Amino acid sequence: MKNTADITVLGAGSYGTALAISLASNGHRTMLWGHEPEHIENLKNDKSNEAFLPGIPLPDLLIPEADLATALAASNNVLVVVPSHVFGLVLTQAKPLLRKDSRIVWATKGLEPETGRLIQDVAREAIGDEFPLAVLSGPTFAKELAAGMPTAISIAGTDPQFTKDLVELLHSPKRLRVYANDDFIGLQLGGAVKNVIAIGAGLSDGIGFGANARTALITRGLVELTRLGEAMGAQASTFMGMAGLGDLVLTCTDNQSRNRRFGLALGKGSDVETAQDEIGQVVEGYRNTKEVYTLAKRLGVEMPITEQVYQVLYKGKSPVDAAKELLSREKKSETSSAE
């Protein structure tokens, strides 16, 4: 089947729209699907996504589409950008509509709720093993990417040609630098764990701790991410790159991060429900914390920061008590295999 679009993006939220804007601005005909017809109609009429990225115009090559069948027929390249808790549902709906030559890439960050499975496992359960899969990850705030500010990401996948094609498709000399990576597991894991550590950084700042504490959390958070990654077969070097250190620093230090702002609100005394309401959008790190904590316990991986964030979110522990417990842990060598 001949393509009528170079790529189809599933998910018309802030990040999906930002990636679609970047692709279309780079000369690629891009179809953007959203599950709410009224929202898609607004995109067409306003020529912008006022609900998520107000004031940023949509390029002429970006085509909003409310019909999933039409969107999936338009291109064999499918970029999924939906929250982790609906990822499986969206792909299950897409399965009978996919072309035989479809190739699936996602920018969804996180693990499957309840099970803690990697997104690749959710994808394979939903659509089978016959389609090439890939993931893109890295330090990206949707608003900056949509506005054309320089950004860098990494891509890894199951098929080298698909990865190469995605690099060519997404790379833009003016706005987006794309690195190929061969660590499919590592790129998926980095996007989940960084959300947990970002909540921890927000908690620390909300309590009133300073830059020293925040930096320590980021550094030791990177250790936790690397430790879990190696236990799952990822490469330690991956976490020194865009999907590890890059995403971690961005999410922990800038208030554009919903996860960081969520932690800030909790540190200042809000309860979980109020803090989520204040953000007004999905806080992936809330679910990710339980998933990462459960996964670490199952694998026997020590992740003390993750454990204390979990205790605050799900067991009602005060942020101050969580910080005290981290500080009072047994003294150990920084370079030992266990923290």
Curated annotation (Swiss-Prot):
Protein name: Glycerol-3-phosphate dehydrogenase [NAD(P)+]
Organism: Shewanella pealeana (strain ATCC 700345 / ANG-SQ1)
UniProt-listed InterPro entries: 6-PGluconate_DH-like_C_sf, 6PGD_dom2, G3P_DH_NAD-dep, G3P_DH_NAD-dep_C, G3P_DH_NAD-dep_N, NAD(P)-bd_dom_sf
E.C. number: 1.1.1.94
GO cellular component: cytosol
HAMAP family: NAD_Glyc3P_dehydrog (MF_00394)
Top EC class of this enzyme: oxidoreductase
Biological-process GO terms, alphabetical: carbohydrate metabolic process; glycerol-3-phosphate biosynthetic process; glycerol-3-phosphate catabolic process; glycerophospholipid biosynthetic process
UniProt family annotation: Belongs to the NAD-dependent glycerol-3-phosphate dehydrogenase family.
Positions with a binding annotation for sn-glycerol 3-phosphate: 109, 138, 140, 194, 247, 257-259
